[in-house]
C-alpha cells in the first residue's frame, strides 16, 4: 500500500522543479496521488476495510489542501498539475 523508495524517487525526479526538490507542492501532490491510487485499488478487493478508508480520507484531504494552496498562489502550475495527474476538481 505504501510507495516504495524506488518509486518515490522516480516520482520526485519526474515532478521536481529543480535538483533536490522534495517539498514543492507538485512533488507532494504526486506522491499523495500515488498513495491514493494504491489505496483505491486495495478497496476494490477489501471493501470493508474502514480503518484504511479513514487513512485514505486523510490523504485526500491533505492533497486537497496542497492543491488549494497552489491554486491560490499560482493557477498555471495548479492547472498543469491537475492535467498531469488526472485529478478531478
UniProtKB/Swiss-Prot annotation:
Single biological process term from Gene Ontology: translation
GO CC, one annotated term: cytosolic small ribosomal subunit
Keywords linked to the UniProt accession: Ribonucleoprotein, Ribosomal protein, RNA-binding, rRNA-binding
GO molecular function, one term: structural constituent of ribosome
UniProt-listed Pfam families: Ribosomal_S15
NCBIfam families: S15_bact (TIGR00952)
Function: One of the primary rRNA binding proteins, it binds directly to 16S rRNA where it helps nucleate assembly of the platform of the 30S subunit by binding and bridging several RNA helices of the 16S rRNA. Forms an intersubunit bridge (bridge B4) with the 23S rRNA of the 50S subunit in the ribosome.
Recorded family membership: Belongs to the universal ribosomal protein uS15 family.
Subunit structure as annotated in this protein's UniProt entry: Part of the 30S ribosomal subunit. Forms a bridge to the 50S subunit in the 70S ribosome, contacting the 23S rRNA.
Protein's UniProt name: Small ribosomal subunit protein uS15
Gene: rpsO
Amino acid at each position: 500500500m505504501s510507495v516504495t523508495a524506488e518509486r518515490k524517487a522516480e516520482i520526485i525526479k519526474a515532478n521536481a522543479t529543480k535538483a533536490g526538490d522534495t517539498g514543492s507542492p507538485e512533488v507532494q501532490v504526486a506522491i499523495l496521488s500515488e498513495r491514493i491510487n494504491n489505496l483505491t485499488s486495495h478497496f476494490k478487493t477489501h471493501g470493508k476495510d474502514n480503518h484504511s478508508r479513514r487513512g485514505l480520507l486523510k490523504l485526500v484531504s491533505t492533497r486537497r489542501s496542497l492543491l488549494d494552496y497552489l491554486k491560490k498562489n499560482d493557477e498555471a502550475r495548479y492547472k498543469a498539475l491537475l492535467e498531469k495527474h488526472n485529478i478531478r476538481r
